[in-house]
Amino acid sequence: MDGKVITELLEPVINKAGQVRLAFQGTGNRWAINDEKHPLLGVRLRPDGLVETSHEDGWNVFDPVGVVAVEWMAKEGEGGGLYL
């Protein structure tokens, strides 16, 4: 997946209660960027093509090439679906 697409998908859920998870090609695992207690605070596409996300207790950097799905698990009452 393209890094610009991922940042565009994540921008609407910044500061919302819920969990963002990424599914990677070739694995059955999903990686949680944040948890329900620590909402996503920011996302940006870095000049090197990697995606950087931030939350209260830190930040993450990942290569978007292997991402096949972005999931948004909204807190009850927040709306939103499973896949962005």
Which residues does each PLM region occupy?
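Conserved beta-hairpin
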Residues: 42-52
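Short acidic DE-rich linear segments
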Residues: 81-84
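Short linear proline/tyrosine/threonine-rich motifs used for host-factor recruitment
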Residues: 22, 33, 51-53, 61-63
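Acidic/polar residues in short coil/turn loops that connect beta-strands
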Residues: 25-27, 48, 55-57
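Structured surface patches comprising rigid loops and adjacent beta-strands/short helices at the edges
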Residues: 36-43, 59-77
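Detector for intrinsically disordered, low-structure N-terminal pre-sequences
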Residues: 4, 19, 50, 66-69
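Anionic N-terminal interaction surfaces
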Residues: 1-39
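A generic structural signal for beta-strand entry/edge sites
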Residues: 48-50, 76-79
